């Protein structure tokens, strides 16, 4: 089932398409939409092991290269932020990036810190990243330019999924894809970055993406959004967990994911 669902999602990777082309998009405006599928910490050769993706590339797809090196170094959070900024960008440390779904208390915290209205997903500590980029960035990039441009043009964005891990019984949140989708104030109109995983002791850190839920939410989100960012998460967790595995168990887990 996991391979089937990933294959389904992978066929839409960074594709601009007419909504009416797909069965779940009936009765929706024919304006083009984008589904951005993030498979972090993997390679093109691994991606091409997915039959449906390979066939899409052979028949009508293209491969592009993008320099996503961040300001002051190359790591996941700077790379995601640089994609969203349209140039090399700097952000706060990992522990100071805090994307959370909207709630009454979280909205109060966000609005008190930023003076801006909260949206569906908000970076509660966005000012740390803004200040880090302003004070130490060398390229003049503006965080959240992509999301802001979407918002300014009346286009709605959504983020689904995360790369969270569990270590020593503690949840360590990783929602860095939101750095690509957010507006200049660290906001994303809607999505689900909290309840998209399931317990799976056979997978890295004892959790995995709930693909059944992800595919349902992707279909539903597609109806009312123009750009959907989907974080698969499992490829990141596998790469991070690799030192805990031997060659055989690593390959077995990779096969389950891909």
Predicted regions and their residues:
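Active-site-proximal alpha/beta segments of enzymes that process anionic O-linked groups
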Residues: 26-32, 42-227, 233-240
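Metal-dependent active-site segment of extracytoplasmic phospho-/sulfohydrolases and closely related
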Residues: 252-258
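Intrinsically disordered, low-complexity regions in plant nuclear regulators
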Residues: 237-244, 248-250
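Sec-dependent signal peptide cleavage junction
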Residues: 19-27
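Sec-dependent signal peptide recognition
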Residues: 2-11
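Hydrophobic core
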Residues: 13-18
